[in-house]
Amino acid sequence: MEMKRLGYRYTKDNDEELNKIAKYLADSKPLQAAAEIYSDIEEMKNIMIDGMCHFIFTKVNGEHRDAYGTRASDIIERHENKEKAPSKRKPAFNGTFSYFDLERRDWRCFRVDTLVGLDRDYVV
């Protein structure tokens, strides 16, 4: 199965979310492109556990979107919009990666195959 060839650099093989992402990318992209995107997604996920990062993806309308995101609960608590009803991260997978958007102060997601890149110079 092609998915196995994508491999794992940082996380354990039992990470269900990354397994789904690997399969989705292997089924939708050439192997080299899938491996590069997967590597960035895996690194983003690990950074966002306790930090924040900057990344770029292509929106549905074709525009590039710069995003600053996290999944760290302490950072989310400091940045979430207190005037609005709290939203929650949706665990369902449909080819997307969810993150807390630090500029919009709410949960957002993007399709994993639209990731343009991860800014490794901006990792907090």
Task: Describe these PLM feature segments.
Residues 24-44:
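Mixed-charge, Lys/Arg-rich low-complexity intrinsically disordered regions
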Residues 94-124:
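Short, compact, well-ordered microdomains
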